[in-house]
Amino acid sequence: MPSDKAAYLAAHYLSTDPPNKSSSSTSKKRKRKNKSAEDGLIIADDDDTSWAQAAKRDSDDDDFDGPVLAAGVVSADFRKAKKSGWKTVGSSSAFAKQATTSTTTNSTKEDIDAAAAADAILAQTAAETAALAREAGGDDEVLVVDTTTGATALTRSHQPAETATQAPIMSNGTHAGLQSASAITAQLKARQEAERLELERIRAERDQQHPEDQEELVLRDATGRRIDASMRRAEARRQQAEAERKEAEKKRALKGEVQLEQARRRREELEEAKLMPLARSKDDEQLNAELKQQDRWNDPMAQFLAPEEVKVKGRKKGTAGRRPTYKGPAPPNRYGIKPGYRWDGVDRSNGFEAERFKALNRRERNKGLEYAWQMDE
């Protein structure tokens, strides 16, 4: 009986493929296999032009043509460890335990081999992606899919650190993306400075290669006629000198004749001083002449000198500072003022001065007559 029971258990429960397995267990196992396959590495053929592949491409919302890497995938996910579903029944526990141990050992070896193969595939895929990125110059973007969270992100594929940190530069010299106003201003200034330096370098190289073809400054007037720069500068200097001369004449006109004469004499004295000897004695004729020409208010000999002998720089003392007077006869007036030298001899007064003098003369005459009459009596 025990042998029959052990044979029955081995035939019905210890077989890996039982003959009378229900459809429900088969469907469950198929679902688990499909799930493990979905969680593992997916290798898709980009060159597949079938209708199924086209439908998958059309259903994708993100129009991304780059390579796709799965993040968060380990080799153990490709082949999950299978637990033994065997049960020990009755007295055949030792046999069942031995069978379970052998099955678990076989499944563990298979899992290790599958994990090693998956790791090799992942390493080969990463190496191929890095090689493609290096050949493309490090500018290709790779879509990384995290299988644990389902998130996707675009990353640079194995490019140098200095190029990975730099954002794309637009045509105006600024970086693409959201930036502050100060950053954009600094980028524009840097672009302008770089363009200015480049232009100066190009001009310097051109001048060194062709020094005879240097640019000449051309000036034109409002009508478009060409103006010579040297003639324009000479005209500007002439106009400036003319303006200074007019300003000096205007200041000179504000001064009187006496001040101008004194200034002229002072200039002449300075010019003559260049030729004078350093020591001047009492016998110096020029010094004595200058001292004689000076007028002093307390000079005791001034009253004995004739007016013709007293001269001030070639002009007589009697005529110095006097205005010309009328030389002909003129009617008298009570103040003794003589008419000007331009008077034409016509008396245009109201006759008061003449009547006054007549009254004075009449009074004096009457006074003399009265005195004479008294003597006669």
UniProtKB/Swiss-Prot annotation:
Assembly description: Associated with the spliceosome.
A GO CC term assigned to this protein in UniProt: cytoplasm
Chain intervals for the UniProt region annotation (Disordered): 1-47, 203-255, 293-341
Gene behind this protein: cwc-26
BP GO annotations: mRNA splicing, via spliceosome
Keywords: Coiled coil, Cytoplasm, mRNA processing, mRNA splicing, Nucleus, Spliceosome
Function: Involved in pre-mRNA splicing.
Lineage: Eukaryota, Fungi, Dikarya, Ascomycota, Pezizomycotina
Ranges in coiled-coil conformation: 185-276
Family matches, as InterPro entries: Bud13 (IPR018609), CWC26_splicing_factor (IPR051112)
Source organism, top-level taxon: Eukaryota
Compartments it resides in: Cytoplasm; Nucleus
Pfam families associated with the record: Bud13
Family label: Belongs to the CWC26 family.
Cysteines joined through disulfide linkages: none
Name of the protein in question: Pre-mRNA-splicing factor cwc-26
